[in-house]
Amino acid sequence: MGKRRGILTDDPQPVNVGGAFLARVAVLTLLLMALAPAARAVPTRGDLPILVILAGFPDRPLAHDRAYFQTLVGRLVAYYTEVSSGRLRIVPHLGGPVVTLPEARARYVQRPAVLARDAALAFSAAAVDPDDVRALRESQGLIVFFAGPGRESHVEGGDPNDPWSNFTMLEQPVGAIHDACVIAEEEIPPLSPFGVLAHEFGHLLGLPELYAPGAATHEGIGVWGLMGQGTWLGHGDQPPHLDAWSKKLLGWVDVETIDHTTTGVTLPTVTRAPRVVQIPASSDTPQEYYLLENRLREGADAKLPGDGLLIWHVDERVNGFRTAEQNPAHKLLHLVEADGRGDLDRGHAAGGNRGDATDPWQGPPAWRRRLGAVSGLLGALGLAAAVLRLARAPAVIPVLLRVAAGAALLAVAGVLRHGPVCGPDTPGMAPYGGGPVRAVIRNLSPAGPEMRFDVLVAPGGESLPGKSP
């Protein structure tokens, strides 16, 4: 890890909290609990006041100064302002006292709720500044930065005494705070703690894990969203946007529902407009549908592996904080991969991956469309010439050759101009409960700031062909 820097001398002195002192703190805490409002969900729109506490251990002090944490928190505010399209405004208060927790760091491994509680109690005992006291009373969420790296960045090695970064809920609220994130101040280089901070804060807002749990070999939603493996994009320093479903759940996107055939649908990128398209997957199950979003490598999405239309197969009947992506055959969120390879569900061991450039859907580029138009014109001219030749002289063989050449050019033109079709023939589109695939997405434009496509929707109980006519 290299040499660590200590807390700068102009920072407040660390507050050591022993057992006897915690007993006195309990009286203050009980009073704060009595004054606390009833438990309620953290708001996902408007202002969200957050208290940030810096906490060291008796056997390991913090290695970074206050400016370091101010930068991390500032980036968190900017990130969620972007991905929520300004609908959520995090209002952080970086607390004055830097506290020292009462137990050694090894005692907090797999005990995030205890770590958060101890940090909040120590802070409440040390807070004398009116702004700190007010933040403790009014904040609706808590972030505790603890000393040292997080276990998540060295699962298969490193120091087993490093606690995990985690989201947790306090058994008893402290002030108005019920939910907390405990975050390592750093990760093992070259990894950054920012992606982990953003991910765990997503849990505080109510989002589930969207990667496969435990020892599962598949990848859930992969790198295509913050709550999946996107946490680690750019070595954890540049996590992507949340996926379309997560934004829908939080109220951060406008949903355009298309339940009948519609041509010329336009969809800007998620970095430019908060819009997604929803298409019913089953006439009998409203909880099952497709969500479409336009992703481009810009803004927070700069490190994505590719650009284009992401088509999500959603089934909200599958739920669970840690189990939503557990079963690769039936997940809350399934990415309908444009390449049809199912790499996310196969996992690395079977030759899969966490997402690649051929997962998003996109139409042919402009040069292919132009070449297709030229091929179509040449094919039509060839057929016309063959007809004229046949009218003048019944030489069958040359005429047939001209007809074949013209037909081939027309076929090439069709392939070049029309591009891929997502429909009944596409892996991952079939409704989980059986029944026909009722939606086809075709005639896609190239990936770009605004994509255009057609949506064909069959009446209930009927299906549509998966290939372009």
Where on the chain are the PLM-derived regions?
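Selective detector of the "anchor" transmembrane alpha-helix that sits immediately C-terminal
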Residues: 370-391
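Bacterial N-terminal signal peptides
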Residues: 25-34
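Acidic, glycine-anchored loop motifs typical of Ca2+
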Residues: 129-142, 469
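Fold-level signature of zinc-dependent metallopeptidase catalytic domains
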Residues: 42-70
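Internal/C-terminal transmembrane anchor helices
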Residues: 398-413
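Extracellular hydrolytic enzyme modules, especially secreted metalloproteases
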Residues: 86-87, 136, 140-304, 315-319
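Extracellular low-complexity, Gly/Ser/Thr-rich intrinsically disordered linkers
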Residues: 270-366, 411-466
